Amino acid sequence: MKNTTGSLTVAFDIDGTWTLAPALFHQIACLFANSGWQVIIVTGRDQPERKIAGMLLWASWPVIVSGPLLKEEAARRAGYKVNVWIDDMPGMIQDCRILRGDGLLNA
């Protein structure tokens, strides 16, 4: 895993998350980075380079495209263990019985 130096990793989504307030999310990501966290971007689909460049301003955080995989799996395959996810669609991050409706909430 790429975050074996003891640092924690935060992953941001693009569409529906970062795109809602790019300047704000950039500041938040910088706060994480300046506090020693590793910042990555995990998106479900390919993004135009121009869009990525505009979003990240001067930062050079890795962008991982999950495609058909759950985002956690895509990040893992890219060598990252994510500790905190910032995403408007948590069901795209990892398999979750509660979100599927077969959890124990109704027990």
Segments the model singles out, each with a brief description of its role:
Residues 1-72:
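Alpha-helical substrate-recognition element adjacent to the catalytic core
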Residues 35, 48-107:
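C-terminal cap/substrate-recognition subdomain and adjoining C-terminal extension
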